[in-house]
């Protein structure tokens, strides 16, 4: 089990990618999904901004997942899936693990909490065990919306991801390596030395 921390662009990395989604798996760039969000960048970088192609592939994988329609959500998609739903899209020589960890409100604001993030990570690791073939996993810091809650720092989702990965890897291997990528614009919000120290305590 190897863990790496990098600052940079998620989509420049090699390996399977983890992409955080809301429970509606919205993909429409604009008012529904920001072009600067991870979902927006994923659509542009990995699907050449072909929303129909991405939606078709997502729908095919989600058709057997439990869902319910929400008539109050009139913009974007209105079919909701359980928090923690994970599907694996197939790319060229790698997969994209799409994990629903937040709830998209009718006001188009995505919210989550610690319990939902933790549960979603559990499901994510299980899916990667089955379909990841023990290859390197590259993921962003999902759950950064938790940092908007007063009293909660940006490092909380980072620590949760690292803790969850290590605990679950000890139960059963997930991948040969997990690389956590921090966006350049978020670099000032974290202390990389503190993260390394936290990792050391987890390995002890």
What are these regions (language model features)?
Residues 1-204:
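Macrodomain-like recognition of ADP-ribose-binding/processing modules
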